[in-house]
Amino acid sequence: MNATHVLAILTIHTDNLPENFQEIIKHEREVIAAWKAERFLEQLFLRPTRNGAILIFKNLTEEEVNEKMKTLPLYPLMKSLEVLPLIADTAI
């Protein structure tokens, strides 16, 4: 059986960042490391503009990914969140 993948695109507000932003980032990295250790987060990519990230989850539903994203320390700074299921092209 093929693993299911879900893509999450997170964009945060970068104007008026809180004073403890570096602390929030540190906690965010800890959460991401735990997700990778639990093996349901396959990869995280930072956006070139540094205003968000792209996360690739595996073996979770869209709903589960949405719930996980709400637990991120950066979530309160969220400007937008897109969660998209991915379908592998098995012909290639």
Regions found by a protein language model. Give the residues of each.
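Conserved, structured core segments of small domains
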Residues: 1-92
